[in-house]
């Protein structure tokens, strides 16, 4: 999700993507729950602080083909004396390299565009393109998301395209449990990165547990490494795959095997 740390509440969807897409006919429903224990405490550019805020995002992803899916996000925020508030929505189509190409790594590309209310993000309309590369090797897993982001309305428009790399490596401790480390950065414009103190640098030790082929679970505790980053947060992702749509199978007309006619 596109984030510009000086002017918006982030932490709505904290995830390093793998290259796989949702299979055709399946719908993935995920709940992202992120609580900031120690974050920003003052209003900046009209944006509410995120300290002690619970950000919850519903992500619905539909698989259409073996290489194409579409995701839709509904962002919400809950804070002391504020109650639940709608933050905004994003849409995210994604394509991937089919398995039949036999590439040595998984590769996909997503693009995401959407709106967030001004009290949650001074940059209300944003866009992102995210290349995704991953690899499973025995018990080890690695994923890299070198995302490029752009604001279309708000104070970050003059910055142009910014660079936000995400990275994850994990090790399968058991057949069900893997432990890993996730990194999330927002480094500034591609034409010249911000000073380190103004960059967003967050490191999240995380756990993934396999409850079954239709489930997804991720939990992590994030620590900010710079003053422009929330200092302490907890994130959790719970996902479930459903079959709401049955893919149409083309009919194959068999040749007439009868030997006679009139």
What are these model-predicted stretches?
Residues 3-5:
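N-terminal signal peptide c-region/cleavage motif recognized by signal peptidases
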Residues 7-262:
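Transmembrane beta-barrel domains of Gram-negative outer membranes and organellar outer membranes
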């Amino acid at each position: 999700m596109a984030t510009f740390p000086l002017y918006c509440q982030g932490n709505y969807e904290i995830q390093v993507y793998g290259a796989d897409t949702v299979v055709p006919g399946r719908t993935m429903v995920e709940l992202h729950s992120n609580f900031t224990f120690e974050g920003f405490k003052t209003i900046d550019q009209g944006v509410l602080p995120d300290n002690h805020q619970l950000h919850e995002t519903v992500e619905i992803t539909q698989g259409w083909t073996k290489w194409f899916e579409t995701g839709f996000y509904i962002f919400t925020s809950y804070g002391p004396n504020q109650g639940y508030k709608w933050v905004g929505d994003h849409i995210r189509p994604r394509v991937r390299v089919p398995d039949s190409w036999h590439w040595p790594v998984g590769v996909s590309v997503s693009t995401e565009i959407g709106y967030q209310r001004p009290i949650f993000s001074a940059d209300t309309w944003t866009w992102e393109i995210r290349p995704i590369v991953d690899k499973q090797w025995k018990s080890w897993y690695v994923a890299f998301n070198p995302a490029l982001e752009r604001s279309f309305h708000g104070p970050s428009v003059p910055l142009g395209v910014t660079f936000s790399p995400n990275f994850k490596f994990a090790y399968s401790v058991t057949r069900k449990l893997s432990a890993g480390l996730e990194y999330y950065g927002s480094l500034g414009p591609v034409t010249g990165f911000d000073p380190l103190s103004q960059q967003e640098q967050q490191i999240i030790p995380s756990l993934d547990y396999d409850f079954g082929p239709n489930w997804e679970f991720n939990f992590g505790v994030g620590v900010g490494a710079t003053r422009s980053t929330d200092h302490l947060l907890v994130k959790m992702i719970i996902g479930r795959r459903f079959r709401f749509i049955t893919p149409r199978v083309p009919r194959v007309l068999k040749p007439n095997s009868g030997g006679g006619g009139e």
